């Protein structure tokens, strides 16, 4: 079919010529049965959900348990981000840097155009306009995703400000990021579809200079919801580098003291290190309250007053389900319980509810994430996939901060970096200054988890928790952080801290109770910002003594807390060659500032 004969192309609700010609070009290439411009309405959402139920992609959950909620079970080959198939196709290879896969953009376009040719046959092509961050921003960051997946359309409605309002913001000639997605599963006439279409061949490709995303073959999460990691981190980090701001893999937390003073924190942790749990913290210390502004991504820029302001570009939560429960994260559970949630790859109970590992209760029988019968204490595999997800509107969160939709964002008092480390790294450390803070973030190490492909348990360096999400050279990225600090008023820069909730004793148990008790660590951080709290100067930064932490009412052995806070010079000396190996890997673009910090650390450790 030519674009003139594809139904729906002639009824576009926009006069944006750039958008229209791109939509036509993609339709001619991919050959869908029809084109639909999405409007983001409730009616459209319900219609698509009904369609997904009919197709067998969605299972409608018991409305008495989860109203207006659904479960999707993916193909077992399509369950997580595929870092091995994710590319940054900058014009020059050096600009992608050592942490990214690179291919010549011309060559990649040619390969992917061959894959896209006719790939939407038998399917509907949806045009999904969306905005990352508040629609009322001075410079709203707009995008359009073209997709042949209804699952993507309904998820994008939850995760972004999607539909008519975003399209109107574009006007007739506004700039937008082009995001093209196909599951790569064309249907021949009369061919029956599968519940979760995808392809064995997968590419998730970014063209940073032209601000484009091309994704093929996966229907899952970050590979397919292109507003999330692809735009908000990979493309946005390249934009931020060019425009003088930061796009970061960080939660945004508001902490309110008993005196009713608010402090805002941005915190970067690798996947599955408790980012969502901290974002939705329930403080255990009397008089302290927490509110959330986001659990995954922060866009930060300096305001006119010289302070660093953060906004969350997302509109929903796309959280890891296993381990989320009424004890670890009651606020996430309340958000989910409000309904309007799409679950992916969790288990289904006999009464139409969902279940996953770590959730209260021991159901005797379930349908597992692969669609098979699962029996308590008999079936040896997990009922829910370790990277199974809930996709739910942010507006349902009971502790959502009122500023969550403010285009100005919130002023950041402290930046936290953290990872999952059994040894070496203390519970909390304050960086000596901004550049030392950049070094701490740049050399962040964490034991690997299930959210990405790779060997679980290995310590991998994950700079600023951005390793899989950098849209340009990691050395240039470190330099960008250093430069922003140099150009700022030092007295207004956020203080930088490193936390590790996961340190273990010799017997393998956790030394710190974590979860809501982490508010005690945050209280010390606030007191450091206010110049009220003590701490010991160590070779790695300032670390509190046991008595510097407010442990009132906490049933924990002081020796355990001391062990969690210990700085063992021998352990750190063993860490040095691992850090050095990573810095050598960063290569020729490693900033002198980061190298200087490493040399100074070596010297302090003797």
From Swiss-Prot:
Transmembrane segments: none annotated. Binds 1 Mn(2+) ion per subunit. The keyword Protease does not apply. The keyword Lipoprotein does not apply. GO terms for biological process: cellular response to glucose stimulus; cellular response to iron ion starvation; gluconeogenesis; glycerol biosynthetic process from pyruvate; oxaloacetate metabolic process; propionate catabolic process; response to lipid; response to starvation. It catalyses: oxaloacetate + GTP = phosphoenolpyruvate + GDP + CO2. Pathway: Carbohydrate biosynthesis; gluconeogenesis. GO terms for molecular function: GTP binding; manganese ion binding; phosphoenolpyruvate carboxykinase (GTP) activity. It is found in: Cytoplasm. The active site is at residue 273. It comes from the Bacteria. PROSITE patterns: PEPCK_GTP. One of its GO terms (cellular component) is peptidoglycan-based cell wall. Its EC number is 4.1.1.32. GTP binds at residues 272-277, 389, 420, 515-518. It is an enzyme of class 4 (lyase). Involved in the gluconeogenesis, in growth on fatty acids and is important for initiation of infection in the macrophages. Catalyzes the GTP-dependent conversion of oxaloacetate (OAA) to phosphoenolpyruvate (PEP), the rate-limiting step in the metabolic pathway that produces glucose from lactate and other precursors derived from the citric acid cycle. Monomer. This is Phosphoenolpyruvate carboxykinase [GTP]. The gene is pckG.
């Amino acid at each position: 079919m030519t674009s003139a004969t594809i139904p729906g192309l002639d009824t576009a609700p926009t006069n944006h010529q750039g958008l229209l010609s791109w939509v036509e070009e993609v339709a001619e290439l991919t050959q869908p049965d029809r084109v639909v411009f999405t409007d983001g309405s409730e009616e459209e959402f319900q219609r698509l959900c009904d369609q997904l139920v009919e197709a067998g992609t969605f299972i409608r959950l018991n409305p008495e348990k989860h109203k207006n909620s659904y479960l999707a079970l993916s193909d077992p080959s399509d369950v997580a981000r595929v870092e091995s198939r994710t590319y940054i196709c900058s014009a020059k290879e050096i600009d992608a840097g050592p942490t990214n896969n690179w291919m010549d953009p011309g060559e990649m376009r040619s390969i992917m155009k061959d894959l896209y040719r006719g790939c939407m046959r038998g399917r509907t092509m949806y045009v999904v306009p969306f905005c990352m961050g508040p629609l009322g921003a001075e410079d709203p960051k707009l995008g359009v995703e073209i997709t042949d997946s209804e699952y993507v359309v309904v998820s994008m409605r939850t995760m972004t400000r999607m539909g008519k309002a975003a399209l109107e913001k574009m006007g007739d000639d506004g700039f937008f990021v082009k995001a093209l997605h196909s599951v790569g599963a064309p249907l021949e006439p009369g061919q029956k579809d599968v519940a979760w279409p995808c392809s064995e061949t997968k590419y998730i490709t970014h063209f940073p200079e032209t601000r484009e995303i091309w994704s093929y073959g996966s229907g899952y999460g970050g590979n397919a919801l292109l507003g999330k990691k692809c735009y908000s981190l990979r493309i946005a980090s390249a934009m931020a580098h060019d425009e003088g701001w930061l796009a970061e893999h960080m939660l945004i937390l508001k902490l309110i003291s008993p005196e009713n003073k608010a402090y805002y924190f941005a915190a970067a942790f690798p996947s599955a290190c408790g980012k969502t749990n901290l974002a939705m913290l329930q403080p255990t210390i009397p008089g302290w309250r927490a509110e959330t502004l986001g659990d995954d991504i922060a866009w930060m820029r300096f305001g006119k007053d010289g302070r660093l302001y953060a906004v969350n570009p997302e509109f929903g939560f796309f959280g890891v389900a296993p381990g989320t429960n009424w004890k670890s994260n009651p606020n996430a559970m309340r958000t989910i319980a409000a309904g309007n949630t799409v679950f992916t790859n969790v288990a289904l109970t006999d009464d139409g509810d969902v279940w996953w590992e770590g959730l209260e209760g021991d159901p005797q029988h379930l349908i597992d994430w692969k669609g098979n019968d699962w029996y308590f204490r008999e079936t040896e595999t997990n009922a829910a996939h370790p990277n199974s997800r809930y996709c739910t509107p942010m507006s349902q969160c009971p502790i959502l901060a009122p500023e969550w939709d403010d285009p100005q964002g919130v002023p950041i008092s402290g930046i936290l970096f953290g990872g999952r480390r059994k040894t070496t790294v203390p519970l909390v450390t304050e960086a000596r200054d901004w550049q030392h803070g950049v070094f701490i973030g740049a050399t962040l190490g964490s034991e690997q988890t299930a959210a990405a492909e790779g060997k679980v348990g290995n310590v991998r360096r994950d700079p600023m928790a951005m390793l899989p999400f950098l849209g340009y050279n990691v050395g240039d990225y470190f330099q960008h952080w250093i430069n922003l600090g140099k150009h700022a008023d030092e007295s207004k820069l956020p203080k930088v801290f490193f936390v590790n909730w996961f340190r273990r004793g010799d017997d393998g148990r956790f030394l710190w109770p974590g979860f809501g008790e982490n508010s005690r660590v945050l209280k010390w951080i606030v007191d450091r910002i206010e110049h009220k709290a003590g701490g010991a100067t160590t070779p790695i930064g300032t670390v509190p003594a046991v008595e510097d932490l407010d442990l009132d009412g906490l049933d924990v052995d002081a020796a355990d807390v001391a062990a969690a806070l210990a700085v063992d010079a021998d352990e750190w000396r063993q860490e040095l060659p691992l850090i050095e190996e990573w810095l050598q890997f960063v290569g020729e673009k490693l900033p002198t500032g980061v190298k200087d910090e490493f040399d100074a650390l070596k010297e302090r450790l003797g």
